[in-house]
């Protein structure tokens, strides 16, 4: 199914800690990375395996290793950077592509202001990471960029998602699988996810304004 809400007990517990109003930058970063690792486990369950033989301590040992398409991780600036280490902890050999998106104040649509994709991105599984799927505009723009670059297998990992954004993305890109720790209640009048996490970018980079 295109949208998968992963309700593993560890994810539910760590997500509850992430939602606290009073949380340090250090704790938010660590928890975001931990939840990302758990989402990565789910998002990669269908990777191809091939039989492989190695030299073990008692001689030849039959094992398996990942084969097929290689992976590129695609963090959306800036908040997506906060999830990057969580993926790399499990897939340290993955290449990283970067997309910068911002809202055009005239059209209110997302536009690309930075793009640095690996040269062979079309031949890789592209895993987009961004803490929040709110209105869906940024994610749709990111998927559009990757498809225009030849990507055929695109997956998305977000910490929390709003139903409005999920519906919008699925209408435009129904084949793209989305993995999230929570489908929240919805968006408020300002376009923020409720209950959400607050401004994930500010919390990850320590730029939260104090009263």
Curated annotation (Swiss-Prot):
<comment type="similarity">
    <text>Belongs to the UPRTase family.</text>
</comment>
<keyword id="KW-0547">Nucleotide-binding</keyword>
<dbReference type="GO" id="GO:0004845">
    <property type="term" value="F:uracil phosphoribosyltransferase activity"/>
</dbReference>
<dbReference type="InterPro" id="IPR034332">
    <property type="entry name" value="Upp_B"/>
</dbReference>
<keyword id="KW-0808">Transferase</keyword>
<protein>
    <recommendedName>
        <fullName>Uracil phosphoribosyltransferase</fullName>
        <ecNumber>2.4.2.9</ecNumber>
    </recommendedName>
</protein>
<dbReference type="GO" id="GO:0000287">
    <property type="term" value="F:magnesium ion binding"/>
</dbReference>
<keyword id="KW-0021">Allosteric enzyme</keyword>
<keyword id="KW-0328">Glycosyltransferase</keyword>
<dbReference type="InterPro" id="IPR005765">
    <property type="entry name" value="Ura_phspho_trans"/>
</dbReference>
<dbReference type="GO" id="GO:0005525">
    <property type="term" value="F:GTP binding"/>
</dbReference>
<keyword id="KW-0460">Magnesium</keyword>
<feature type="binding site">
    <location>
        <begin position="130"/>
        <end position="138"/>
    </location>
    <ligand>
        <name>5-phospho-alpha-D-ribose 1-diphosphate</name>
    </ligand>
</feature>
<dbReference type="InterPro" id="IPR000836">
    <property type="entry name" value="PRibTrfase_dom"/>
</dbReference>
<feature type="binding site">
    <location>
        <position position="78"/>
    </location>
    <ligand>
        <name>5-phospho-alpha-D-ribose 1-diphosphate</name>
    </ligand>
</feature>
<feature type="binding site">
    <location>
        <position position="199"/>
    </location>
    <ligand>
        <name>5-phospho-alpha-D-ribose 1-diphosphate</name>
    </ligand>
</feature>
<dbReference type="GO" id="GO:0044206">
    <property type="term" value="P:UMP salvage"/>
</dbReference>
<dbReference type="InterPro" id="IPR029057">
    <property type="entry name" value="PRTase-like"/>
</dbReference>
<dbReference type="Pfam" id="PF14681">
    <property type="entry name" value="UPRTase"/>
</dbReference>
<feature type="binding site">
    <location>
        <begin position="198"/>
        <end position="200"/>
    </location>
    <ligand>
        <name>uracil</name>
    </ligand>
</feature>
<dbReference type="InterPro" id="IPR050054">
    <property type="entry name" value="UPRTase/APRTase"/>
</dbReference>
<feature type="binding site">
    <location>
        <position position="103"/>
    </location>
    <ligand>
        <name>5-phospho-alpha-D-ribose 1-diphosphate</name>
    </ligand>
</feature>
<comment type="pathway">
    <text>Pyrimidine metabolism; UMP biosynthesis via salvage pathway; UMP from uracil: step 1/1.</text>
</comment>
<keyword id="KW-0342">GTP-binding</keyword>
<dbReference type="GO" id="GO:0006223">
    <property type="term" value="P:uracil salvage"/>
</dbReference>
<feature type="binding site">
    <location>
        <position position="193"/>
    </location>
    <ligand>
        <name>uracil</name>
    </ligand>
</feature>
<comment type="function">
    <text>Catalyzes the conversion of uracil and 5-phospho-alpha-D-ribose 1-diphosphate (PRPP) to UMP and diphosphate.</text>
</comment>
């Amino acid at each position: 199914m295109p949208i998968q809400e992963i309700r593993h007990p560890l994810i539910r517990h760590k997500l509850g800690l992430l939602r606290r109003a009073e949380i340090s930058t250090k704790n938010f970063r660590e928890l975001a990375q931990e939840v990302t690792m758990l989402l990565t486990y789910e998002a990669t369950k269908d990777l191809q395996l091939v039989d492989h033989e190695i030299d073990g301590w008692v001689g030849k040992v039959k094992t398996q290793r990942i084969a097929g398409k290689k992976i590129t991780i695609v963090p959306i600036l800036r908040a997506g950077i906060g999830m990057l280490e969580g993926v790399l902890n499990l897939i340290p050999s993955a290449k990283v592509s970067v997309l910068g998106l911002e809202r055009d104040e005239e059209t209110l649509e997302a536009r690309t202001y930075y793009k640095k994709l690996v040269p062979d991105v079309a031949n890789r599984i592209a895993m987009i990471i961004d803490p929040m799927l709110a209105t869906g505009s940024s994610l749709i723009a990111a998927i559009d960029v990757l498809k225009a670059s030849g990507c055929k297998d695109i997956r998305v990992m977000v910490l929390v998602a709003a139903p409005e954004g999920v519906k919008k993305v699925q209408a435009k890109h129904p084949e793209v699988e989305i993995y999230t720790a929570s489908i929240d209640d919805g968006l408020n009048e300002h376009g923020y996810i409720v209950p959400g996490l607050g401004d994930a970018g500010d919390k990850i980079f320590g730029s939260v304004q104090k009263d």
